[in-house]
């Protein structure tokens, strides 16, 4: 059985030849809420013709409750435990693109699992970009505070040094989702142990 997923992507080579690429490890998108992990990860997966999975959606499916409901009923420690269990299960599967919740990479055990079985890509965004993207969303339980922007700033300050431990980092600022996905694809191309091409 061949390891990885062999795919054909639409290359922009000058000679017009199609580029074959094989994803050999799961790509794990990490970063703050609002960084674009789900949107960019989904676009990346489409471009590589591999499955896209969202760990938060998988947790909600397993619990038959929303993330906000899990936080309210069972608390954050319970959620983090379930998050680690789901992450371990997804990393054991075939190579794919996996989006994780903003706090998933904070747990050392999760970082170790990702390092051993996949490759982490940090979508890096500043406070203004993140706030613009999340301020009108009511689905972020950690931002249900009297001053959500300040809460977001404090989270960013605490988490950025940990996100910096990711294998790769890509700026998530200006540009379309597709352009950001291309930047991630280019970063992955520097890792032949992750993405193999015939170029």
Swiss-Prot record:
For binding substrate, which residues are annotated in this chain's numbering? 56, 80, 102, 159
What's noted on cofactor binding?
Answer: Binds 1 Mg(2+) ion per subunit.
Question: What top-level branch of life does the organism fall under?
Answer: Bacteria
Keywords assigned: Amino-acid biosynthesis, Aromatic amino acid biosynthesis, ATP-binding, Cytoplasm, Kinase, Magnesium, Metal-binding, Nucleotide-binding, Transferase
Required cofactor names: Mg(2+)
Q: Which sites bind ATP?
A: 34-39, 140
InterPro entries in the record: P-loop_NTPase, Shikimate/glucono_kinase, Shikimate_kinase/TSH1, Shikimate_kinase_CS
* UniProt pathway: Metabolic intermediate biosynthesis; chorismate biosynthesis; chorismate from D-erythrose 4-phosphate and phosphoenolpyruvate: step 5/7
One Gene Ontology term of the molecular function aspect? magnesium ion binding
Q: Which GO BP terms, alphabetically?
A: amino acid biosynthetic process; aromatic amino acid family biosynthetic process; chorismate biosynthetic process
Cell compartments where the protein resides = Cytoplasm
The EC number(s) this enzyme carries? 2.7.1.71
Q: Which GO terms describe its cellular component?
A: cytosol
Q: Which residues bind Mg(2+)?
A: 38
Q: Which residues form the signal peptide?
A: none
Quickly give the catalysed reaction: shikimate + ATP = 3-phosphoshikimate + ADP + H(+)
Query: Does Metal-binding show up as a keyword for this record?
Result: yes
Q: Enumerate the PROSITE patterns for this protein.
A: SHIKIMATE_KINASE
How is the quaternary structure described?
Monomer.
NCBIfam families recorded: PRK13946.1 (NF010552)
Give the family per the record: Belongs to the shikimate kinase family.
- Sum up the protein's function in the record's words: Catalyzes the specific phosphorylation of the 3-hydroxyl group of shikimic acid using ATP as a cosubstrate.
Q: What is this protein called?
A: Shikimate kinase
What organism, scientifically named, is this protein from? Cereibacter sphaeroides (strain ATCC 17023 / DSM 158 / JCM 6121 / CCUG 31486 / LMG 2827 / NBRC 12203 / NCIMB 8253 / ATH 2.4.1.)
Q: What does UniProt list as this organism's lineage?
A: Bacteria, Pseudomonadati, Pseudomonadota, Alphaproteobacteria, Rhodobacterales
Which gene is this protein's source? aroK
């Amino acid at each position: 059985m061949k390891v990885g997923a062999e795919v054909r992507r639409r290359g922009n080579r000058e000679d017009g030849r199609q580029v074959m690429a094989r994803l050999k490890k799961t790509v794990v998108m990490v970063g703050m809420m609002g960084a674009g992990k789900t949107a960019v990860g989904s676009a990346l997966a489409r471009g590589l013709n591999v499955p896209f999975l969202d760990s938060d959606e998988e947790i909600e499916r397993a619990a038959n409750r929303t993330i906000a409901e899990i936080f309210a009923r069972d608390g954050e420690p319970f959620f983090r435990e379930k998050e680690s269990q789901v992450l371990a299960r997804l990393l054991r599967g075939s190579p794919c693109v996996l989006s994780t919740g903003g706090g998933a990479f904070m747990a050392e055990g999760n970082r170790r699992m990702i390092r051993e079985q996949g490759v982490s890509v940090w979508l890096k965004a500043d406070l203004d970009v993140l706030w613009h993207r999340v301020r009108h969303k009511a689905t972020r339980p950690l931002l249900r505070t009297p001053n959500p922007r300040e809460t977001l700033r404090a989270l960013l300050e605490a988490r950025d040094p940990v996100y910096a431990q990711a294998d790769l980092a890509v700026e998530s600022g200006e540009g379309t989702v597709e352009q950001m996905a291309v930047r991630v694809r280019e970063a992955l191309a520097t890792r032949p142990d992750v993405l193999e091409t015939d170029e």
